[in-house]
Amino acid sequence: MLGRDIVYIPQNGHEFLNPSKSIRSQLFDSMEKLGVGASDRDTFACEKLSQVGFSQPETILRMYSFQLSGGMAQRVTIALALCSKARLLIADEPTNGLDQDSKQQTLSLLNSLFPDAAKLMITHDISVAAACDRVLVLCGGRMLETGSASEVLSSPHHPYTKALLGALVENGMQETPNLRTETGVCPFYRRCPAATELCRREMPHQSAQGREWWCREE
């Protein structure tokens, strides 16, 4: 979906691009909607490809989508989106499969390339959601919770939101205690759903049937 005012950046660039048409042809189709003259289209296309990080845009113009890597195809879809006057940018999992540094680079790129457009990010990545102004939590197609990203992700009301945050392997939304200054505190205290004030002061030792544990829980 590449309209004049609304553009969509898909999760998979290869599925979005037409394998039977060159990248030049697909960019030219979008430029025609924007009103770019035929004599200016090659220059305009190279400019957009350069903006998304291609050092040899002329080579990319001659290629087809099946000749591109996944990352290259994704950048071409962003270049296509640039051939618009987007007021709304919809990005479906724009950081899927990327490491943390690449995620930040992608989000920064979208912000710099579309400074005046509203951005709707569809994501399962909490770090991406945290970079947004507002979040909407969906489950089974239903809205369960919405609000500012900082409030929803730090103090969720709905059990589903709480479960999502609690399921994070890195548990990045919680602070890791400083064990040098919090002597005697259970190291899991800040992240444990069963924690009480007692856990801040003691770690009772228990044993049974050859097993040992340091917790008040049976």
Where are these regions (language model features)?
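ABC ATPase NBD coupling module
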Residues: 1-7, 25, 33, 151-156
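Q-loop/switch helix immediately C-terminal to the Walker
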Residues: 12, 19-33
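Conserved ABC ATPase "signature" region
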Residues: 40-59
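Conserved ABC ATPase signature
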Residues: 63-68, 72
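A short, proline-enriched helix->beta-strand linker immediately N-terminal to the Walker B motif
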Residues: 83-87, 116
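P-loop NTP-binding/switch modules centered on Walker-like glycine-rich loops
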Residues: 94-172
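Charged, flexible cofactor/metal-binding loops and thiol motifs
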Residues: 147-218
